[in-house]
């Protein structure tokens, strides 16, 4: 999918998604995580579709992995959910509870919300 098409879809659906999730996060596009971060920081992250940064209050979409409207909408929903979650608690689940991604309550919540993606399909 072209970057232009990803921008078009994002511009169409994100205002409604962000309103519904009460998120004021901004969206930026990069081809992949390596394009945004140094290679050392991005090790083992080459499959990321998107991510939310609590430091910048930004959602980063990685265009190399966006091949459908569904991917884009799901990613925007998922990261909007993270934008409303506590960073300290998010990290504590990993660091103090030793949970992995699949068992992390915040990831479970974000993935649950992703299932509502068709609500934003046009």
Where are these regions (language model features)?
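N-terminal low-structure segments adjacent to metalloprotease catalytic domains
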Residues: 1-4, 60, 85
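Zn2+-dependent metallopeptidase catalytic core
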Residues: 2-26
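Post-HEXXH active-site segment of zinc metalloproteases
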Residues: 70-74, 86-114
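Short helix/loop segments within enzyme catalytic domains
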Residues: 114-122
